[in-house]
Every structure is written in structure tokens, then in C-alpha cells.
Amino acid sequence: MKAYLSNPAKASLLLVILIGTVTLVHAGSVYHSTDAINKTAVTNKATASRAAAEAKRAEMRMVVATATSIYADMDLEDSGLSRQAFQNAWIGYYKLKKKGLLKKTNVLTICDFSQSSSNQRMYVIDVRNRRVLYRTYVAHGINSGEEYANSFSNKMESCKSSLGFYITSRTYSGVNGYSLRIDGVDKGFNDNARKRAIVIHGANYVSMRVVHKYGTMGTTFGCPAIPTEMTTQIIPVVKNGSCFFIYYPSKKYLAQSSVLNS
């Protein structure tokens, strides 16, 4: 060491070696420090993701519990409305409301197509006061089935009903009289509703009289038609931004609905 210190050139070389060693040690420390930070960030992100997923599951458990309570309190089973129809309707209604997509949140309409068309299978529910405002007949598309609807489509000219969630829009007077436009918001299942001219309208072939005479309810080109005399009662209540749901226990729909699974 003394030899190095007495020789300026060797002293400089020693200094360079020492600085390089310190630099390498420091660089290694920085590397290990950065690696630790990255691992911590990944861990924190995973923890946050799990927490968010659990919070969402807890939220859905609460929504389902609320639906179960309302279903029981309103004795909806006695009215023929299936538990699954109401539960899914409530979940979708909740999600659409949470996203701010519903202008009118005090009304929820459910068409339970798991029932026979000769049943009064359309329910207009007062959400706030938890009571059924109207229960009436509703027709399905001619190519969806006869007494029971069991085939559904979003395709043009299919003449089939489309499953899923809709948001009601404006009224108009057309060939079927006082009618209501609806917008399908379930991607791939009913989002062609406007193009297909799917609306709520009255029809004289939707009545018990028709069932008694012909043995089955009349059908449509895909519209959820109701008795003509009910249009002036129901349409003003549900128009302009309320949730309208057409249900059937389709495994594909329930698994892929963009509303239910959002």
C-alpha cells in the first residue's frame, strides 16, 4: 500500500479500483432495492385486486338478499313470477341504476317468458312502494314458439323475441296506435331492437278472448305486445327511461349478458 501511495500513477490506479468497487456495490444495492419495490408493487396490486373482487361479491350478495326479501314480501311467487326472473331483473335494474342509465328508477317491468302466453306474465312493479301496479298479458314473437316462447334472436327479420334488458324511451302513435319505443342494452342479445322496430304496443289478439277462441295467444313480429286497453294505463307509467326486462332461463343469456355480468 505504501508503494502505491508513494507512486502517483499507482495511487491513481488504486483510487480508480476503489471507486469502481464502490460503484458496483452501490449499483447492486440499487438493483436489489428496485427489485424489492417492484415485487412490493405487484403484491399490493394483487391484494387490491382481490379486495375489489371480494367487495364486488359482497355487493352482489347484498343485492341478491334484497331481491329475495322483496320477492317474499310482495308474495310474487303466488302471482306466478319465477324467483329467478325477479332476482335477475333486480340485479340488472340495480346495475343500470348504479351506472346512471335509468331516468325513471321507481318502476321495474318484467316479462316472464318462462310462463305460458295464456298467463298474465308481464309485471309492472312499483319499486319504491314494493307493489305490483299492473299484471297483464304480453305476446312473444311468432318464431319464438306457440304457447311458450323458447327460441330468441337479435337478428333482423327473425320475427323472434329478444331476451334481456331494455330502457324505455318515447311514445309515438303508429299503425298499432299508442306505442312505446324501447332500446336494448344487452349487447348481442337485444341491441338491434331499434333497427328491428321492436316496441311496446297494443294488440287486439292479446287477450283471454283470443285464447278461448283459438286455444293460444296471438303472436307478433318480435314486439312485446299487450292488450290494447292496457296501453293507456301502462305506457305512461313506464315510458321515458325505466327498466324493462324480458326473461327466459337461457343458460347462454344468463352466462353472457353484458348487463348481468358487468
Task: Indicate residue ranges for each PLM-predicted region.
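Active-site proximal loops enriched in glycine and acidic residues that flank catalytic Cys/His/Asp
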Residues: 248
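Cell wall/extracellular polymer interaction/catalysis modules
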Residues: 35-220, 228-236, 242, 251-253, ...
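Short aromatic/basic micro-patch
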Residues: 225
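Bacterial Sec-dependent N-terminal signal peptides
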Residues: 1-37
